UniProtKB/Swiss-Prot annotation:
Protein name: Glycine cleavage system H protein
Family: Belongs to the GcvH family.
Pfam assignment, any one: GCV_H
Annotated gene: gcvH
Source organism: Magnetococcus marinus (strain ATCC BAA-1437 / JCM 17883 / MC-1)
Cofactor(s) in the UniProt record: (R)-lipoate
Gene3D superfamilies: 2.40.50.100
Amino acid sequence: MSIPQELYYTKDHEWLRKEGDEVVIGITRFAADQLGDVVFVELPQVEDTLQMGGTFGVVESVKAASDLFSPITGQVIATNPDLAEAPELVNEDPYGKGWMLRLKPEDPAQMDALLTAQAYTAWLETCSSFAVRFGQNLTL
């Protein structure tokens, strides 16, 4: 599984990309694969303020429904309009066309607490080892 090096990650399997003074957020390939075919994505409204650690939406798949957690505090300035008609973009292109929202961070320093690609790769190895050790499928 390819982990884009330029992104930031969370242990909840979300990615963040800095674009100027904004941040784009989505879920990782690992999360999309664990969920299976995504059939619906519920996202916040533009201008909503998200709190770090709070839920901001739901991803529903053929296997499960999973909450989405905000990795940083900020104001929603855009959501991906394509996901309403084509939620499968989350599976097909999680780091590109499957992006979920764009935030204006309240405190950009919160990004410093996120995982690098290398740290996220190590986290995935820990998750996989746990699943093998205890004979469980990982679900989000």
